[in-house]
Every structure is written in C-alpha cells, then in structure tokens.
A protein has these predicted regions:
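N-terminal positively charged helical leader segments and presequences
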Residues: 1-69, 120
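Structured adenosyl-cofactor binding patch, chiefly the S-adenosyl-L-methionine
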Residues: 209-246
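Active-site/ligand-binding-proximal alpha/beta "capping" segment
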Residues: 164, 169-211, 220-224
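Short acidic/polar active-site loop segments enriched in Thr and Asp
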Residues: 33, 103, 221
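RNA substrate-binding interface of SAM-dependent RNA methyltransferases
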Residues: 71-173
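Non-catalytic positions within long, well-ordered alpha-helices that form the structural scaffold/packing
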Residues: 28, 98-101, 216
Length: 246
C-alpha cells in the first residue's frame, strides 16, 4: 500500500507539481526516492495516484496519475466543541476524533478549563492541532481533513451559532451528568438522515451550571452517556462514535 500524503493544492491527472513544503519534508523524512509511488489527497474528495519524479534538497516534484473517487467518510456531519483538556490529551483527542470521522472541532475556554491560550500561542496551537488532524487522515484513509477552528470563549462561540432550519436541521447536544438527562442514544433515535449533530463537551470537571444554562438557551439539549463519570476526552469520543454509527 502506497504511503498517503495530504497536499493542499489543485490536482489534475497527468499534471506535474511541486509538493508544499510540509508535505515535501514528510516525504524526505521517510527517505523516499524518485520512481516510488505515493497517494495524494487535497481534501476536495477522493485521492490521486502519484509518482515521485525529483527529490531536491528541500523540495519534491511528483507526477499525478489516476484519480480515485473513493470516500471513507460517514454520511452525517458532526461537530465537536469542547473545553480543552490539558496538555497532550488535546493532541490525542484531535487525532482520535479525526480517525472516528468528526467534521470540525471547536476548542473552547470555559470556567474550568486548565489549558488557557491567547494570541500567538493560541494560533500556534491551532496550527499544531490542524497538523495532527492531517496526519490522522493520512494514517486512517480519510480524504477530507476536519477543520480545527481558532480557540474561542464559550459564551462568544455560542453567539455565533446559526439557527437550525428545516433545510439544515441540527441536533445540538450538551454532554451532562445532571439528574433526569435523557440518554444520547434516545436523542439519536428519530434523527433525520440529513441532520447534522453538534456536541458540546466540558473540560475536566465539566461545564458550570451557568454555562450549561447558557448552552440550553442557545438551543442545546442535555444528554448523558450513562451513570459513570468519564474523562473529558473519553466522553467526547464516545459521543462521536454513537452519533456516527447509529
């Protein structure tokens, strides 16, 4: 099986192109040579056969072959908005959420967030997490890379959400341990096939009561994953699996 690489450039059968710097570095690290076959995808759908034609000191040229309209994506659009877990656990969550099939991720600051980011540091983290998502797609066979959005405060992000409509139905689920909360599996039973899902998950310790109330006022409904208290990243990934495999 040929090694897979993401390249954010236009592609056409028979074209010769120079790989973007980040992709070229990846090819060079693997010590690949001219004549070797690789697979390229650009996030626009499907993937391309390609052959390395030249290896420079810092650049790599390839010739594109056939396009394969293969898609390994799930049919439903699912967004995950979450209070960021600490340190490397966010990297792991982005990687696994991408492998499962999330469409977009929204990192959030909440009242109980341990990880706090702003300015240049926030931008660097966003770019890093986007790179983690790219690498996960290269590994798992996905041809559409999920978007990792800039870090936002929860309240500010909630204000940006568009209203759901009959043409674009959205189920907005707040992961909660509050008494009387309906199981997520029940909320998904009658979900139309064309409906998107947006999950809001808190950091360690969950969202505060005030934050949950703010989310509910913005159209979210509380759902539970069961009686056990799951780690922040475990809860988020469990919800994704249930929504994408109902």
């Amino acid at each position: 099986m040929a090694a897979r690489f993401f390249a954010d450039v236009p592609m056409a059968a028979g074209a010769t192109l120079s790989l973007p710097d980040s992709t070229a570095r990846h090819v060079q690290v693997l010590r690949m040579q001219p004549g070797q076959s690789i697979t390229l995808f650009n996030g626009q759908g499907g993937e391309w056969d390609a052959s390395i034609t030249r290896m420079g000191r810092s650049d790599v040229d390839v010739c594109l072959g056939a396009h394969h309209a293969s898609e390994r994506e799930v049919g439903r659009s699912v967004q995950l908005a979450l209070g960021m877990p600490a340190n490397e656990r966010m990297d792991w969550l982005v990687e696994k959420a991408t492998e499962i099939g999330v469409n977009s991720l929204q990192p959030l600051h909440t009242s109980r967030s341990v990880l706090r980011l702003s300015g240049e540091r926030a931008e660097k983290k966003q770019n890093h997490w986007q790179s983690v998502a790219v690498a996960a797609c290269e590994q798992c066979g996905g041809n559409r890379v999920p978007t990792v959005a800039p870090v936002r405060d929860l309240a500010a992000w909630l204000k940006t959400l568009p209203p759901a409509s009959a043409e674009q139905p959205v189920l907005r689920c707040l992961l909660s341990l509050a008494d009387g909360t309906q199981p997520l599996a029940h909320a998904l039973v009658d979900l139309p096939d064309n409906a998107a899902v947006c999950f809001l998950s808190g950091p360690e310790g969950g969202l505060s009561a005030q934050e949950e109330a703010l989310a509910i006022a913005s159209g979210f409904s509380r759902v539970t994953l069961g009686p056990r208290v799951l780690r922040a990243e475990t809860a988020a990934l469990t919800a994704l699996v249930l929504a994408l495999n109902r």
